[in-house]
Every structure is written in structure tokens, then in C-alpha cells.
Amino acid sequence: MNRPIRFFSFRLSLTFAALLLITASGAAAQSTAPDIKYATAFTIQSFDTYRLLTVTRPWRGADRTFEYLFVKRGTPDPEGYPGAQRIETPVSSVASLAATHLAFLGRLGTLDRLTAIANPQYVSSETVQAGIAAGTIAAVGNGPDVDLEELLSVNPDVVTTFAMGKSTKDDYQQLLSLGMKTLIFSDYMEETPLGRAEWIKVMALLFDQEAEAERIFDDIERRYLALTEISAKLEVKPSVIMGSSSGTSRHLCHQLESPFITTEIRIIQQTIRI
């Protein structure tokens, strides 16, 4: 009488194990989306061993998107993303062709991974300038004239850049043709300060620091919203004259074409005078 019972128990165990495998395989295919509150130019989907970043608005009037797979080191490549660029994380080195990206690296505590920078004259970070002076951070050109030979000699794990949809000014196609992992940031497309700040979540993907990026951004959001509440209560709202400077020359704006600037001024409830 014991044999049928043991046989039934064995069959039950097999059934239970099969259910576990089915459940596990189904869970692996599920994704979660980080809370993107303000940014509108990218989306992120998180899976067990990789994250999918889609840059939905790489430049003004763009008719294409860019997909990136951030795959945890030592794990197999996911299937089903033929056009996506694969970046193994965490990266050990990064080259930045835009000075604005350095703020994200600084807040994440990853400036020590920076090995090359373009437009060093626009860099105010003392840490980065010291690295350039010491030769640990390479200066790889200015504007659209990137020193590709120098950049190749540095051989970073990934290059962060931006694009404008103009072949004479964009460098990402050349970098890709040379086999370099190239991540396009379009934070400049965001029309609000918090939208731009939220791109720290994109930079964090390179270093597997998503949780840290969430914490940093939540703090930025809290402090920013607190300041806007203060400005909303001000009875006297100063006028603003918009302009730019180049050397000893000063230029006043005759019109405001940047949605970012107009949105920022509107948020703090100031009056535009042009």
C-alpha cells in the first residue's frame, strides 16, 4: 500500500516543480517602469538582468528613436531587440562630450570613472580640471571637432554625447562606426528644470545606481518645489532682462525661443521684460 502513495507524492512534487518553473519564467519576462515624473524624452523598462532605455526625442523634429540595453555583467543578452545598442554594466570608464553630463556624474559620485571630456573650457569642476592637468582625463576636442584618434586611444567603455539631427554637428554616427558604445543624452529637449534633472536616472543606468539616482532626484524635487512655493507667495515679482555674453560683448534677446527658459520664468512667477 505504500508504493501508490509514494508514486502519488512523486507525481505531485513534479507538478509543483513544473508550476514553479512556469511562474519563474513568467516573472522573468515581466518588466517594471521606474517612476519618471517630469522627463518626456526617454522611457526606462527594468527587467531582472537588464534595463531597456528608449530615447524618444533625441533632437527637435526627430523622426526616430534610440534604444539601449543595459545588461548586467556576466548575464546573457536578452532576445528581441535587434536595433538596440548593448552596454554592459557597471561601466568602468566613460567619456563625456557635453559638460552638462558632468553634473550627473558628480552627484552619483562617479567622476572617478571619467577618462575623457570635450570642451574643457566650459568645465567648472575643480576635480575634472585637476584630472585634465594631471593627464588622467583626456581633452578630446571642442564643439563638433572631436579628436577621434585621442578618444580611441582612451578607449572608454561608453561615450555620452548629444545630437541635433545635423550631420555636420553630430558625432554619434562616427563613434558608432568606430565600434564605440555611444549613449545620446537629450536632456536639453526637456522644457522644465525637473525634467532635465531627471536625466540623472539615465546616467545611473551605466553604474547600476538606479536606487541612488531616485534618492538624489527625490531630494532635488523636494527642494525645488519648496522654493517655488516660496516664490509664489512673493508680493513683489522682479522683472527679467534676458541676454547672453560672449567675451566682452553683451546681447539682449529680442525673443525667447527656449521653452525651458520661459517655463522656468513662469514657474517662479516672474515677469519677462525683453
Predicted regions, residues:
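Bacterial N-terminal signal peptides
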Residues: 11-23
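N-terminal ligand-binding lobe of clamshell/alpha-beta domains
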Residues: 26-274
